[in-house]
Amino acid sequence: MPRALWTAWVWAVIILSMEGASHQASSLSCDPTGVCDGHSRSLNSIPSGLTDGVKSLDLSNNEITYVSNRDLQRCVNLKTLRLGANEIHTVEEDSFFHLRNLEYLDLSYNRLSNLSSSWFRSLYALKFLNLLGNVYKTLGETSLFSHLPNLRTLKVGNSNSFTEIHEKDFTGLIFLEELEISAQNLQIYVPKSLKSIQNISHLILHLKQPVLLVDILVDIVSSLDCLELRDTNLHTFHFSEASISEMNTSVKKLIFRNVQFTDESFVEVVKLFNYVSGILEVEFDDCTHDGIGDFRALSLDRIRHLGNVETLTIRKLHIPQFFLFHDLSSIYPLTGKVKRVTIESSKVFLVPCLLSQHLKSLEYLDLSENLMSEETLKNSACKDAWPFLQTLVLRQNRLKSLEKTGELLLTLKNLNNLDISKNNFLSMPETCQWPGKMKQLNLSSTRIHSLTQCLPQTLEILDVSNNNLDSFSLILPQLKELYISRNKLKTLPDASFLPVLSVMRISGNIINTFSKEQLDSFPQLKALEAGGNNFICSCDFLSFTQGQQALARVLVDWPDGYRCDAPSHVRGQRVQDARLSLSECHRAAVVSAVCCALFLLLLLTGVLCHRFHGLWYMKMMWAWLQAKRKPRKAPRRDLCYDAFVSYSEQDSYWVENLMVQELEHFNPPFKLCLHKRDFVPGKWIIDNIIDSIEKSRKTIFVLSENFVRSEWCKYELDFSHFRLFDENNDAAILILLEPIDKKAIPQRFCKLRKIMNTKTYLEWPTDETQQEAFWLNLRAAIRS
């Protein structure tokens, strides 16, 4: 029994393992180019069966714990390997040995406590390596990266346990485009640890405290282009002038991201700008200033300028003690050389006039997403403010009057580019005043409904996108670029209003078509973006757009941006792919052809009817239908005649002088119905024939050549054909007055031809001795 249980347990383990392997294989999806995606699929190991066809493998965000030297040995062509956000705690020595073509390796956010240089010794082609977020304390006992000559991006460290940087750590690295070091708890930095790297384009340092920051700066200041400091509290930062005062610096840009300052540490940073003379650009992003701006007490006035800083960017600056903040007058003298200033999302409602006047070199000012209004703008754009300002961005502030805004900016004599988008103007006055050199104006997302002559005639670029405009009828003789997307325009603007227009963006309106003539009317048009409209794919429109190869060079969003909205059977299709039927595109020709065909058909029908007596058949059909509406057989009391006689007018002598004498003067007499005397005057002759036959017990047909040629005899015979012969009775009596060639009987008298072949008929004898027998037989036939 225990043996059986043991066997069952072994088989269960094998089956579950096979199911797990099958599940993992099915969880990995690969496309024909060798890109395999297995991220976020709860994998606990690297799937088996990987081949040399795999070029990119994404296994991030799984539960993989172990990488063996067999997992990837066949992936010799692998270039990208993503193993981030797993539970990897062990990587065997030769796990990546066969990946000689690998260029991108991500091992971030795992549980690696020790790093080994043997992992990377064969990765000569590696360009990107991410080791962030693991639990190691150091970068190993030997140089990790000495075998990576092509490495350009390196990310190392973690936020908790990484505490030491040693001189050997970066040995072998000569040039890096980006180096990111996460060392919030860094305790030991051995001098010259980063000095071995001769050139670093961008260094990102995550440091909680600035204790070792100056030591790091000393090593990199001569080989670094851009330094980015993240998540750092600079409350205790102190800049040592002697440390770098005599060094050749190459740093051009400083970025502070999520950094905390005090008044004191801010002054220390300003000192740094003076001594690192190469700094041209400074950026503060999502930083906090824990102070009140009392820089005068900190001897800031002894600093004459900000070094060579030309560009200053501040985004999302937080000042907890904002209402206690000083007037910043102590920093005014430092701003004389600054050319570009951006202050976004920082609750700026006023730039003091005195500060504006000190910004004598300012050419670009961006105050987007702040609280500027016309009242405060009046103080900011005071006399002599920003004398060389060319570009002013006031996007998403609290401006409401377009007329007043233009008047307030008249002091800016050199202003040529104004962005006042995302303000709530609603309407536009008929006339406005603007600085005389205005060339670019952005009024997008301002909720305006119409455009007026308020716009300056000197404009070369105008953006009125995302408004409520339904027309454009302004004359702007110098306008070169028009951005008017996401409005309610139904057609392209009139080209005569815009004679030098070269770029037009008009997507997302309700335009349903445009023509070659319209585009040709813009002689200098080089780029048109008109996608996202509700195009009616008419034949002319499709012929124009699909037949002009050069059009693709003008339509910048062709072909994917152009979709049909009508007709319904091509709705949603790309204009380039839509096809219409011949009848839709050449309706007049098709209608003409159909009319011609109908005419020919009618003509052919008429010829055939004449040739095959079609009209006669129609008349007979009508007569038959008339007869159908009457009882099949008249009641006995309605029978008025013993026989109806159908004969030709040319045979009337025989009928009236011989037949009538022999039958009506016989005893007992027979009552005959003759059309000459018994038809009702004024009644339609067809109805007379039908009524007479129905009121007669028998119908006598006097057949002769004249009978066959008689029109009325044909009617009488054919009615009998429909009414009497189809009843399979003996109501019809045929008298052959003279011999008739059966071939002379028309084909339409098929019933008569058949009867003459199958039924006995009475033949008028020319011998007088036989005529008495003829009359005797005729009387007997009538009585039967």
Swiss-Prot record:
Residues 1-20 form the signal peptide. LRR repeats lie at residues 54-77, 78-101, 102-125, 126-150, 151-175, 176-199, 200-223, 224-250, 251-278, 279-308, 309-337, 338-361, 362-388, 389-414, 415-437, 438-457, 458-478, 479-500, 501-524. Glycans are attached at residues 114, 199, 248, 442. Residues 21-587 are extracellular. Disulfide bonds join 30-36, 353-382, 432-454. Ubiquitinated at Lys-754 by PPP1R11, leading to its degradation. Deubiquitinated by USP2. Residues 525-579 form the LRRCT domain. Pfam families: LRR_8, TIR. This is Toll-like receptor 2.
